[in-house]
């Protein structure tokens, strides 16, 4: 036991000093480090007996004349009992609980004189596994600040007793998992097989970017409202691996809804309080809040216009929307017209590698056309008469009307 729970075995001696305190001899489990996922890895040492290290026989002195520590009367008896550096009458040295006389040994703690039975009832440690009493002849194992019976120190998954030299992992709630079960659970990544390991880091790390976790792939929640467990086809059901579904009762659901209305993204401390109040696992509560926030976002999108464009519009989309309006994009050039715009591939100073500058290529069907002969124009300028000068103006399509000035 720790120093805070130590007790003192005293005896009746003649004017001696306070004897040293005797501790229950217990073997601690040696902490050899930590492993992945921040789970604490422990190596079991050999178990020891749960019993006091030594006891002393009572010794009665024949010195009198001192005052009794119990009744404050002078001790005129032939024999005097000395306990904790104080003198006692033989009739005054009794257990504070059962009032039995202390004739052999006594136990003292917090200023109380107790017999062995009452001291065990008050201060003896109890097994953290079965909450049973630890007797002095019991073999025990210690993990952190907990003491276990040998029969109670077992893996919480396979129920195998952990022996000396075995490696184990301490999980949440002082549960122990053997190495093989921990590795199996880590590979399968099933959140309901074991809890997440205890981490020495800050608790706020679990509250950062919780929405990035795909909650639907890990735990299915069945609260009557969630859309997480609904799929559109049988292919999606076979493609996604789902964990066991958790049924949330009406009272638990009401508690979660009230907490969501107050804090849509609760901290770890609030989730722990909700877990204690509803009896649900913290992981289930975290996934429920994630699904609820996702549902609120979807409802808000549907309520305020809802459509969110997933890509930029293309030319075909615009043409389909306005089939009679081609002002957005001009029509493509004819297929018989080709444009060549080839840059220089090497230095232009080398005449062997110089290519032609960008030019317009004439269609092949027009290459054999004979140009018309050149005729010299007359040097006399043309004459115009204002009376015969007319402009064409028409109201009827296809019927020009001459207009004289």
From Swiss-Prot:
Q: Where is the LIM zinc-binding domain?
A: 68-124, 127-187
A GO molecular function assigned to this protein is: RNA polymerase II transcription regulatory region sequence-specific DNA binding
For the cross-link Glycyl lysine isopeptide (Lys-Gly) (interchain with G-Cter in SUMO), the position is 17-18
Q: Mind telling me which Gene3D superfamilies this protein's record contains?
A: Cysteine Rich Protein, Homeodomain-like
Instruction: Supply one GO BP term.
Output: positive regulation of vulval development
Q: Which UniProt keywords apply?
A: Developmental protein, DNA-binding, Homeobox, Isopeptide bond, LIM domain, Metal-binding, Nucleus, Repeat, Transcription, Transcription regulation, Ubl conjugation, Zinc
UniProt cross-references to Pfam families, sorted A to Z: Homeodomain (PF00046), LIM (PF00412)
SUPFAM superfamilies given in the database record: Glucocorticoid receptor-like (DNA-binding domain), Homeodomain-like
Which InterPro entries is this protein grouped with? Answer: HD, Homeobox_CS, Homeodomain-like_sf, Lhx1/5_LIM2, LIM_Homeobox_TF, Znf_LIM
Purpose of the protein = Probable transcription factor which is required for asymmetric division of vulval blast cells. Involved in olfactory plasticity probably by regulating the expression of transcription factor mbr-1 in RIF neurons. Plays a role in the chemorepulsive response toward ascaroside pheromones mediated by the ADL sensory neurons, probably by regulating E-box motif 5'-CANNTG-3' containing target genes in the ADL neurons. Plays a role in the differentiation of the ADL sensory neurons.
Name of the protein described by the UniProt record: Protein lin-11
What is the species of this protein?
Answer: Caenorhabditis elegans
Designated gene of the protein: lin-11
């Amino acid at each position: 036991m720790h120093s805070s729970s130590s007790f003192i075995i005293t005896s009746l001696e003649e004017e001696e000093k306070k004897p040293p305190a005797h501790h229950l001899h217990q073997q601690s489990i040696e902490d050899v480090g930590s492993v992945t996922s921040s789970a604490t890895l422990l190596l079991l040492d050999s178990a020891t007996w749960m019993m006091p290290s030594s006891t002393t026989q009572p010794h009665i002195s024949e010195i009198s004349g001192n005052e009794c520590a119990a009744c404050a009367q002078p001790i005129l008896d032939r024999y005097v009992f000395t306990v904790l550096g104080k003198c006692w009458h033989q009739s005054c040295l009794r257990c504070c609980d059962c009032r039995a006389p202390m004739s052999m040994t006594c136990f003292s703690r917090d200023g109380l004189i107790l017999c062995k039975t009452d001291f065990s009832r008050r201060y003896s440690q109890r097994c953290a596994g079965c909450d049973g009493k630890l007797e002095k002849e019991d073999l025990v194992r210690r993990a952190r600040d907990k003491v276990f019976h040998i029969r109670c120190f077992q893996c919480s998954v396979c129920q195998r007793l952990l022996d000396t030299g075995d490696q184990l992992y301490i999980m949440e709630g002082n549960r122990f998992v053997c190495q093989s079960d921990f590795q199996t659970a880590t590979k399968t990544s099933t959140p309901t097989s074991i809890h997440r390991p205890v981490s020495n880091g800050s608790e706020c790390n679990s509250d950062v970017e919780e929405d990035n976790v795909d909650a639907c792939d890990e735990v299915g929640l069945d609260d009557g409202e969630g859309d997480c467990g609904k799929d559109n086809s049988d292919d999606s059901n076979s493609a996604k691996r789902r964990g066991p579904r958790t049924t949330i009762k009406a009272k638990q659901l009401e508690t979660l809804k009230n907490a969501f209305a107050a804090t849509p993204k609760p901290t770890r401390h609030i989730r722990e309080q909700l877990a204690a109040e509803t009896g649900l696992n913290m992981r289930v509560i975290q996934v429920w809040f994630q699904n609820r926030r996702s549902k609120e976002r979807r409802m808000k999108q549907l309520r305020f216009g809802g459509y969110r464009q997933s890509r930029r519009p293309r030319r075909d989309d615009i043409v389909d929307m306005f089939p009679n309006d081609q002002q957005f994009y001009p029509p493509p050039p004819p297929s018989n017209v080709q444009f060549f715009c080839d840059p220089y591939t090497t230095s232009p100073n080398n005449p062997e590698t110089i290519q032609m500058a960008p030019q317009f290529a004439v269609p092949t069907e027009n290459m054999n056309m004979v140009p018309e002969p050149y005729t010299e124009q007359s040097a006399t300028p043309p004459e115009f008469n204002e009376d015969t000068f007319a402009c064409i103006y028409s109201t009827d399509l296809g019927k020009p009307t001459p207009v004289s000035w």
